[in-house]
Structure formats: structure tokens, C-alpha cells
């Protein structure tokens, strides 16, 4: 599970075994693809030859027509035989295909027919596949014709000789620029090796030549699936419109339906695929995977048996089940399934790579490294994912490990001295609080890895940099997250992220890894808000505005909304509101019962009925009423007014309008800004006061309290500025600059009361734990309260941050140790201070006390 940054874009679906962020993909190639799709709506082009007509019939799924058209062609020609065999293979008639291919392959061992035979033998797990494919690949070095080069490329790719395949495809593409079949085959290999931008370019080149080339449409859909699922689905559906018998497209759409938690739809698509090809290995694998995650053990084994009856070494049937288990947070089971796959295909680099990723998510990093290194040894071609993972693990090996009970932290050595003081205590607080609330003690050890570089965090989770909107992830017993240094201070709440992910530890384990995403994410955001209300306010205003626009989600669509970049921010927030509604309606007992019901392996409809005797339709009514009670006044404060229209009004007109619309937040804010611009600060202040009364939880520098604080500063009204900054940081947790400004103002007005300054400094280090001044102040306040152990923690953090006055920092720490009776430690710190500043009087006095044994 992930915690997103609600201040920025969101990461699509998690846990994704295939989710990779490629900014260039979306920015540079997706838009032109729409043009290709529009062209694809054009009528079918007339074929210029019988062979082209037969090829067109195959691409569009008219397989019987392929047989008819082939009869008009040279029955001995390898290309004709290969096309006829492909039509048979598409319908699962493997024996028939083999019978027509083998004689021609024997006669022409480097022909298209030989290639199809080799690929068929490989799919069926036949021992002779390698020899057949090597014969097809052999002419690659001397081939000059595009078709010959492409044929060798396909054979080389099937053999796992990707560098040679790359050279063959490159030469074929140059020999026949834009050839749809060549560009598509080239794109498929690029996609397999995670080069999505180049893969999409190849698919687009194919579609520019032939907009109805269905394999290129499906390749495009696969390329887009992680970044833009709705568009990917639209592209795949277009391919299926052209070729209604396209099994690969049906299987792809089924996988997308699974991601959206539409399992019935997925099964229907897979059953349709099996009508076309009853022996489709991919369809059986996905049905088996669905049976597995639905705990239908007998059905799972039956589907596995069907696949293995076709291809006895088809380890993919277990690998796919493992992938889907991982997407459903069942990472230990994913490891077992990947290992079952390896019993059938021990040297499959893809399965080994999957095993490595699954092991990473269980916390077995040595095992993960071994699996990934073995995968890379078997297939060293341009796989940046595996290389990234190994590089990331090299980085992790340099981290400091901190063990505290069932918690194991891995922290960058540059940050460990500071972070371990806060993160360990916060994690214990979170787990203790939530374990009591949910009456559940999670199984440990719980590994928490905190990365100072966001890209290392992203690679740890999905193998590639990116995940721009994600802040943390949880895999049941493993938590990964950005450290406060991974992003500018004030851009995210690292403490909230840690709390959020530890809530996932509870819900994932408590449900036996079967909790749906809407519930586990909803609980995590809900628990953030329970811990500190200010953590959860960043979406309040946007949600109220969405209510006015009718853009909120139906509860039944909530889980699916997590798969779309457009709706995922709303999905997180609305899921938390639903959890709040569940607690208000059924109590914490009801929420606990719902989580435990999922552990029985039932779906959401059954879980709601069993645990709470309700369903989404009944919940929707009460939920809507609850939302209106909570957000109704704020929603009404935003109703109707257009910010641009208000900004364009002349000031007299705006004053008149605002007088008539006293309950309009946008109008009051527009008036305040206009009055401030026209040098009427007192009037502006009154407008902002009215705005603040309408929406007291507004955040950001343009919020009413932030604006009033600035006006007060301009007027040199420190008392009012302090009041406004206090109100501002109460609602806006992220603004570290405002908190620092507030401490400065308090000190300027002579305030030295720890009760007033302490909470502000606490806020500063909650946002930026690397602020030495705040730690120093908190340490000295703790000494005043006679809490030397708390003071020592703060002073240790100061020393770790490399203060300018190291002598004073050592002396501070020495005094805290002295006060707590740790005289040896106090003496070490005192000597350290004197080594820096031999005449430092405070250190000299303390050393004298220590030497003489005075209290």
C-alpha cells in the first residue's frame, strides 16, 4: 500500500509488479496515439494481393477466412503455411498447426514456417524448440532483406539472445521503415525490457502505416497500462472491435478488470477468450490466479492442471498467480508460487526476477539479491529494473540498522543519528495505539526503511525511479518511505507517512492480507486524522468544491478509483470519510469485525453483509448525509462564484457584490486581495476575517490566516501577526516557514515561556527534523522541566547535525547527562567541549564538579 502526497500528483495502483513511471512516455508520445486511434476508426482497407488479404483476415480475427484464402495461394510456400498455422494456433488447434508446419520447416529450416514451429514448440514445452529456433536465427548475420532480419530477430528474442535480436530488429526497421509487423515485434521486445518510450514509438510507427494493425494497438495498450489505465483500456477495446477474436486483447482487458476489482468481468473476458482458444495458456493462467486469490484451491489446481496438460513446463501459470497474490498484499504466498514456477522452469529469468521482488517485499533482502543476480546472469540484456534493484540494495547495505523490539529500522548513516530519535518512538507510539484500538498485535519483525533519495525509495518498491506522488509503501511486514530530506521541508508530512504505513501493517495482517484497497487506505488516512487532525486537512477544501461540482465518487466505485490517476487523490480522502462513517454508524467493534471478516476470504459484498448487515447502496444514503453534515457549510461557502470573474471585477463592484454575498468564501477572498492591492489593509483584514470564519481550515499561503499574518507584519503589528500565524499553523501542518516566523516573532516580543515556544519548535522538527535550532531550544526547555533524558535526546540530535558551536553543543549534552546521573558520559562530552574550546567556562565548571564528585 502507498501513502500518496496529496499536495502533488498521485501514484496509480499499488502494489504494482508492473508499475513504472515514465514521464517522457506521457509527455511525448501519448497524444499522437489518439490521432492514430481516430484513423483506426476508418473503414477496412482493400487488400492488394491474396496474401495481403489473408494476412489482413488473420490480423482482424477472421480465421476461417484465412483458411479459405490460403487455398488460393501456393500451399508449399513457407509464408502461406505459417499464416495458416497461426490461424490454427489462434484457435488452439496446436496439433493441426504442428502437422502443417513440420514438413515445411524440415525443408526450409530458416523459413517463416520454421519460426512458427519453433515458437509453438517453445510454448508447448517441447525439447526441440531451441534447435528449431537456432536454425531460424542462424542467418541473422548475413541477412539483408527486412523479412529475413525480422524473422531472425523474433527467433533470437525467443532464445533470450536479446542483444542479437536488437541488432536484427534495428536492421530490419532500417530496411523497411514503418513496416507494421516489424515495428510491432520490435516494440514488443522493447516493452519486455521496460523501454516504454521507445516501445510506444515503435507501436505508433506501425499504426501510422496501418491504423488497424491490432498487435500494435494492443502493444500500445500494454505500454500505457500503468501510467494511464483508462486510455490503455480504450486502446485495447479498439483492438477488440477490429478483431473480436483477439485472445491476447481479451486477456489484457481481463487483467485490467482484475486491477479494478471487477473480477466477474475479468472471468467473463477470460471465458470468451477460451471460446476462441480453449487451450490458451494465458487465459488458464489468469483464471487460475483469480481462483487462487479467491481461495478456491480446488479450482486453482484444476486450472493449473489444464495449463500443464497443454504445456507441462508452463511455469507462468504459477508466476501469474504469484503476481496477482502480490498485488493483493499476499507476498509470502507470492514467494511460494514463484518457487513453484521455478520447479518447472528453473532457469527462467523472468520468474527469478519476480521472486526477487517478492522476497524484497517480505524483507528477505539477501534472498532477493541472490534471485535477481541469478536472473541477470541468465539474461543480462538492458534490464534496468534488475540493475536498479541491485544498486539500491548496495545503497541499503551502507545504511545503519537500528533494532528496537520488533522494529528494525534501516536509515542512511547521514540521517540515522537524528531520525532514530524521532522515528523509533513515533513507530512504537503508532503501533501501540492502533494495536489497542484494533485489538490486534501484528506479527514482526517489522522492517522500516527510510530513504533520503526518493528515487531509491521508488526503486525499492517497483524497480524504477518515479512514483512521484508516493511517499511511503507497506507490504505487510515491510515499510518503505521517503525521509524528510527526500523532499523540500514543508512539502510532505513524514510523520504522517510513517503513521499511515504502520496502519497498513495492522489492517493487512489483521485481514490475513485480504483487505480491499478502499478499506486499508481509508483506515490509514482515517488513523492519520485521529492521531493529529492537522495531518488530514489538505483535502478538505478540495472535497467541498468537488461536492459542488458533483465530482465525488459512488461508494461502489471507490476501489476502482484507486487505479486512475485522475481519481486517486479523491479516492484516498473519500475512503477515509467512509471509514469515519462506518465507525460512527457501527462503532469500532463493527470496523474490527469487518476487517476480520475479510480474513475469511469473502468479497466486499459478502463482508459488508456478514459483518455489518449492510451493503454499499444502504451505506451510500447515510454516507451522503454524513458528508453533508460535515462539509455542508463549507460547500455552500464555495457555491456559485467564479474566481476569474471575481478577480476581474472593479473594486467598487466587488464591494457591492460581496456585501450581497456575505457567505461566499471566494468573494470575501477576492475582496481581501483587491483591498490589499489598493493599500486598504484594515478593510482587507476584515474581508479575510469573514473568509476565515466561513472556511477555518483553509491551508496554503493564499489562505485567510496567512494573508492576515502578512498584513500584520506589514503594519508591524507583532501581536496580531502572532495570533494569525498561530491560527495558520493550527490548520496547515506543512508550513515550516510560518512556524519559524512565529518563533522569531515570539522571541522578538520577549516571549521565552516554554509552554508557548515549545509546541512551535515541536511543529518545526515534526516537519524538518534536521533543524538544529529547534532541537537546541527543545533540549533546554526539557532541562528546565527537569527532564534530562528528553534533553539528551535533543542535544544528541544537535551534535549529529554538525552545529557551528560544537563546544556549546557538547556542553549542553554533558549537562543533560550530568543531571540524569550519567557521569561517565557527561565527562566524555565535557572533555570534547574543552578540546574544542579549552577556556570554555561552562565546560570547565562542569569538569570541576565531575572531578570533585559534587552534585
Where do the language-model regions lie?
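Juxtacatalytic substrate-recognition/specificity segment
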Residues: 56, 201, 234, 241, ...
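Structural signature of tandem alpha-helical TPR/SEL1-like repeats
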Residues: 91-99, 124-132, 159-171, 192-205, ...
